[in-house]
């Protein structure tokens, strides 16, 4: 029997049950026991659903209450001292992630950053020279017992020790976290021994760092690690998000029992690696895309897999390319999608069914079944809705001048100072304000047809008026309309641009209880009508202060959507860039003097290997500049980025040529600014001065210290003051309190820094 397995399954539930259970517990409305019961129910449901769909080896240990890296930190007892309070439990985990929990003292949350090149996030492990590890939280072992009690075929899932250390950060200078490997391996040996004692045969040990360009000392660390971990259980070395062919010499020397390859992200590595695999190894072929919603063309996969089956026999497994965490749960809930469009898609459960089909086929099943399943994708190739001549013609007619502003930044900066007359250290926010229950109910009533368009418009205008009044009372210098009309910064534009499909239950986890519902790019993209103009004009009519027009940039819309698989990402980005360009021109024509084009995802789109970086950055920068360039010098273009390590992309960030960039820096204590200082970044910067992901309200002294730190690296006349990110997920009480502190801190420092 050909083993069919997934690397992980979405935790949140088809209707976001985990999200609502977490938030209820955090609000004190339910008990920890009730939350734990919800998690157990979801795990059982998901295991059984995968089994029914055709998966015959189930992932156990992929469930996480916040993220799997944080879960690993608790497993090996790598909990920062400030978050400890009695025994390690769920509240310990939430204190690390959120800065506070229903029990225990509040403390600064751990730093959060992107999981490789995805829109998923993890809490960065913190390491010190005297770090000690021990067997800690028992969640993994408890879940193995749960699955075995149900009689299910178990494959334990464990983040590998080298990748775990790689994903962390030293909290003191003078040592490398790699020095901690030997101590960590002792605990990993205990983990594997305990899993073996529970009757676990296979452990999926994830080492995604192998897809990166690793320093030699980190590459060699794998040899030491897997020499010591060999024995108790069979180890499936699991890689994803890119090719690991460049690590062939290391990988084929490791004492493991199999290798998983992401053959969606890097199909070419199959020919490079398979001939060199040890004769006894399993090959797990990751052929079903775990990061997209498109139905797999199984008929195209069949010949390659059949040849592998003939060569490897039972040593060939079929799998998702990566965890299905990055895919929505169940397509059968999407009753409102056009049936033809729906026939192009497969969500997590349907991908399990695809694996089952492949497994059956490889074990002698009928090719006709595979061919029939793939037919909707064949039909799509000739669908007239997919390729639009007008869009293609406009792209073909672009010239170099379409990607450039009228003048260089120094000329623009003077024109903007003369026009805007802002004070030193201008204060602003990133864009969104709290999405209250009142706003959500208003949107739900409108979508359900229980209120008409005029009532909805009046309701949103009331929210905008409230946001403007609150900002003026706080004393902010540059205002925003608050985005009450937007359920999501990408989905909103996906609904209004032609070329996207919007799902109802296509939710995926971003971090913790935060879920996003990416639109799906299905055809060529264009803008039938203005998308933000009327709301922004209304907001500006209420105040004499400048109101920023708020747009999401083309690279972020692309990265935070499920992309097409039949055209390049560059092609889609430029199509979106043209649509945003038209919106920018309309906003400027309406008198909006500051326009923000958010690109928080530009770093996450970066390929994992340096050799591929420049090609991506070239088209990403061009797409942004295409969207931002149709304005006069006195119109100020802002952009926002978050969770970014800017060292790799600082030249590209400068090449965007935005007049002002706001970035997320408070959790890293302004360390991210070092890249801008070393590069001598020429334009204006707004480093975030407080962490919006934590509900804690910062002190004025804390913010003043961060502004002073920033002013040592960026001249004060090019410095803005703002929160780290948008405030959509916060409540108004904490939002107003934090912004008042921020404004007061700024006013206190203006004379000092003048």
Swiss-Prot record:
GO terms for molecular function: 5-methyltetrahydropteroyltriglutamate-homocysteine S-methyltransferase activity; zinc ion binding. The active site is at 693 (proton donor). Pathway: Amino-acid biosynthesis; L-methionine biosynthesis via de novo pathway; L-methionine from L-homocysteine (MetE route): step 1/1. CDD domains: CIMS_C_terminal_like (cd03311), CIMS_N_terminal_like (cd03312). Coiled coil: none annotated. Belongs to the vitamin-B12 independent methionine synthase family. Catalyzes the transfer of a methyl group from 5-methyltetrahydrofolate to homocysteine resulting in methionine formation. L-methionine binds at residues 430-432, 483, 598. It catalyses: 5-methyltetrahydropteroyltri-L-glutamate + L-homocysteine = tetrahydropteroyltri-L-glutamate + L-methionine. L-homocysteine binds at residues 430-432, 483, 598. InterPro entries: Cbl-indep_Met_Synth_N, Cobalamin-indep_Met_synthase, Met_Synth_C/arc, UROD/MetE-like_sf. GO terms for biological process: methionine biosynthetic process; methylation. 5-methyltetrahydropteroyltri-L-glutamate binds at residues 16-19, 114, 514-515, 560, 604. Its EC number is 2.1.1.14. Disulfide bonds: none annotated. Keywords: Amino-acid biosynthesis, Metal-binding, Methionine biosynthesis, Methyltransferase, Repeat, Transferase, Zinc. This is 5-methyltetrahydropteroyltriglutamate--homocysteine methyltransferase. Binds 1 zinc ion per subunit. The keyword Zinc applies. It holds the Pfam family Meth_synt_1. Zn(2+) binds at residues 640, 642, 664, 725. Its cofactor is Zn(2+).
């Amino acid at each position: 029997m050909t083993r069919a397995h997934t690397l992980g399954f979405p935790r949140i539930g088809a209707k976001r049950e985990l999200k609502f259970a977490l938030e209820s517990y955090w609000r004190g409305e339910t008990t920890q026991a009730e939350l734990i019961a919800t998690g157990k129910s979801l795990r059982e449901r998901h295991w059984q659903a995968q089994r029914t769909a055709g998966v015959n080896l189930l992932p156990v240990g992929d469930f996480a209450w916040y993220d799997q890296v944080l879960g690993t930190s608790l497993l090996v007892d790598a909990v920062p001292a400030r978050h400890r309070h009695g025994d390690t439990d769920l509240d310990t985990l939430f204190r690390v992630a959120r800065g506070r929990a229903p029990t225990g003292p509040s403390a600064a949350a751990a730093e959060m950053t992107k999981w490789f090149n995805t829109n998923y996030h993890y809490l960065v492990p913190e390491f010190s020279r005297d770090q000690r590890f021990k067997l800690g939280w028992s969640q993994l072992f408890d879940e193995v017992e749960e699955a075995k009690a149900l009689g299910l075929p178990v494959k334990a899932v464990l983040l590998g020790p080298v990748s775990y250390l790689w994903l962390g950060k030293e909290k003191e200078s003078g040592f490398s976290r790699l020095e901690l490997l030997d101590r960590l391996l002792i605990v990993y040996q205990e983990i594997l021994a305990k899993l073996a004692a529970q009757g676990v045969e296979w452990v999926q040990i994830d080492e995604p760092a192998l897809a990166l360009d690793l320093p030699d000392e980190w590459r060699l660390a794998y040899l030491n690690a897997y020499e010591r971990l060999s024995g108790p259980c069979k180890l499936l070395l699991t890689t994803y998000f890119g090719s690991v062919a460049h690590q062939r010499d290391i990988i084929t020397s490791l004492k493991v029992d199999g290798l998983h390859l992401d053959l969606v992200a890097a199909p070419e590595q199959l020919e490079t690696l398979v001939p060199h695999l040890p004769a006894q190894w399993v090959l797990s072929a990751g052929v079903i895309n775990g990061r997209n919603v498109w139905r797999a063309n199984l008929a195209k996969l069949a010949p390659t897999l059949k040849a592998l089956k003939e060569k490897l026999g039972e040593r060939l497994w079929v799998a998702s390319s990566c965890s299905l965490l990055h895919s929505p749960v169940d397509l059968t809930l999407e009753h409102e999608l056009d049936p033809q469009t729906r026939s192009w898609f497969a969500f997590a459960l349907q991908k399990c069914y695809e694996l089952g089909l492949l497994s059956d086929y490889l074990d002698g099943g009928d090719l006709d079944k595979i061919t029939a399943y793939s037919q909707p994708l064949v039909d799509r190739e000739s669908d007239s809705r997919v390729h639009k001549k007008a869009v293609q013609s406009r792209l073909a007619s672009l010239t170099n001048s379409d990607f450039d502003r009228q003048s260089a930044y120094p000329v623009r900066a003077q024109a903007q100072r003369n026009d805007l007359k802002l004070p030193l250290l201008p204060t602003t926010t990133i864009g969104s304000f709290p999405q209250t229950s009142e706003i959500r109910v208003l949107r739900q009533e409108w979508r359900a047809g229980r209120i008409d368009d005029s009532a909805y418009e009046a309701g949103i205008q009331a929210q905008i008026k409230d946001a403007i009044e609150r900002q003026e009372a706080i004393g902010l210098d540059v205002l925003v309309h608050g985005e009450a009309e937007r359920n999501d910064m990408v989905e909103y534009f996906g609904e209004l641009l032609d070329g996207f499909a919007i799902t109802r239950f296509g939710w995926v986890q971003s971090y913790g209880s935060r879920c996003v519902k990416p639109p799906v790019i299905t055809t060529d993209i264009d803008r039938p009508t203005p998308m933000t103009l009327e709301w922004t004009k209304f907001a500006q009519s209420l105040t004499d202060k400048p109101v920023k027009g708020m747009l999401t940039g083309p690279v972020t819309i692309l990265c935070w959507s499920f992309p097409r698989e039949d055209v390049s990402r560059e092609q889609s980005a430029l199509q979106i860039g043209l649509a945003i360009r038209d919106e920018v021109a309309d906003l400027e024509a309406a008198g909006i003097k500051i326009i923000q084009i958010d690109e928080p995802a530009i770093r996450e789109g970066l390929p994992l290997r340096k050799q591929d970086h420049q090609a991506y950055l070239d088209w990403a920068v061009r797409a942004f500049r295409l969207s931002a360039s149709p304005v006069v010098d006195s119109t100020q273009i802002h952009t926002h980025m978050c969770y970014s390590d800017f060292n790799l992309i600082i030249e590209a960030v400068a090449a965007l040529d935005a007049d002002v960039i706001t970035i997320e820096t408070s959790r890293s204590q302004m360390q991210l600014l070092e890249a801008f200082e070393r590069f001598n970044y020429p334009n204006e910067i707004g480093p975030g001065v407080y962490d919006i992901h934590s509900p804690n309200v910062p002190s004025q002294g804390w913010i003043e210290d961060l502004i002073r730190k920033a002013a040592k690296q960026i001249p004060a006349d090019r410095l803005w003051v703002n929160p780290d990110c948008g405030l959509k997920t916060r409540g108004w009480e904490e939002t107003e309190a934090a912004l008042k502190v921020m404004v007061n801190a700024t006013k206190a420092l203006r004379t000092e820094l003048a």
